[in-house]
Amino acid sequence: QAYYKEQTGENIRIVYQTFDINEIMLTKIEKGHEDFDVVCPSEYIIERMLKKHLLLPIDTNFAHSPNYMNNVAPFIRKQINKLSQPGEKASRYAVCYMWGTAGILYNRAYVPDSVALSWDCLWNKKYAGKILMKDSYRDAYGTAVIYAHAKELKEGTVTVEELMNDYSPRAMELAEKYLKALKPNIAGWEADFGKEMMTKNKAW
């Protein structure tokens, strides 16, 4: 608030809202229940919002930062622009907040480093009832298809990006198969309570 006042001379009151999953936020906006100045969704939601004309162009003054322009901008802009729609570049509407944050958090007291190097550990019955998954269908789908295509990924015959954007009936059936096999191992689908479960050794 103080920074905004310093930059613009205007007083504002910040209202900060969080949502368990992207889709709840998107539904509120689509139904006209909420308007936001800034939202922080995952990339697939940015793509949906752009398709539905739910975004406004952003002020790009920040882009005059030499460090951003020389080190970060070229790669990030390329990735964001993959979400572009006809006549609309996504980088006019979005900037990157985090990148490549999906991974495995584990307790070394129960799970060796060598085991956690592969998504295979999630399907290991040894850890049944001690695994939490993010309550995100995108993350769950990605985990399943990456695991299912581990051999092809290693051989370089397919990329993660191609797998994540393949929603063909065959891809969906394969993801369903592996997620059903994973289900008995899952203790819960979490948005934020996972950290507490980890600290109490209720999840590994």
Show which residues each predicted segment covers.
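Short helices/loops that flank or line small-molecule/ion binding pockets
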Residues: 24-35, 51-52, 121, 177-180, ...
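Structural recognition of the beta-strand scaffold that forms the well-ordered cores
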Residues: 14-17, 37-40, 96, 103-105, ...
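Ligand-binding pocket segment of bilobal, Venus flytrap-like solute-binding proteins
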Residues: 130-133, 140, 144, 150-204
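Hinge/lid segment of periplasmic solute-binding proteins
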Residues: 44-99, 113-117
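Extracytoplasmic
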Residues: 9, 34, 41-43, 90-92, ...
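Early extracytoplasmic/lumenal segment of secretory-pathway proteins
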Residues: 1-52
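Flexible hinge/capping segments at coil-to-helix
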Residues: 112-126
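Hydrophobic/proline-rich hinge and linker segments of small-molecule sensing/allosteric domains
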Residues: 101-113
